Amino acid sequence: MVFAGFQRRLGRRLFFAAPFALAAGAAAAQGADIKFKRSTLVIETGGRELKFDVDMATNDIERSHGLMFRKSLGPYEGMLFDFYQEQPVSFWMKNTLIPLDMIFIAADGTIRHIHSNAVPLSTDTIPSQFPVRGVLEINGGSAKLLGLKPGDKVKHAIFGNA
């Protein structure tokens, strides 16, 4: 009975694999329960100050979850990722349901690079192009609409200028 032996081997494999599958599912579910701290930042551009309410992603779990599974963002809302020191970073849009602009910010709060309209659900990597301290994600197309550009300043406590 080759089939019976196969069934036993398959049953053992499933028995040993089940805890890992459950753990992976629990980790994904845990991400849905993350309570991000809220903060306010200001972007200085073209003689204006634009105020944003942001969720803070300050640890590996928060940064890896980011805006995944969100269905919407308000017009002046976003997420600020803090990497604590300047470094090259890359993002992707896996499990992210809305287009985003990614604003890459130096340690002094200067916008270094803007990636516009990142494609929802894409697994293509989006590099910072420069070492950065933080990344601000806002609604796709907002950076252009608001006239944001490299060289503009972001004021927030993590940049020491708020």
Model region roles, listed by residue range:
Residues M1-L10, L14, A18-A24:
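N-terminal secretory signal peptides
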Residues Q30-A162:
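Compact, glycine-rich, soluble single-domain proteins
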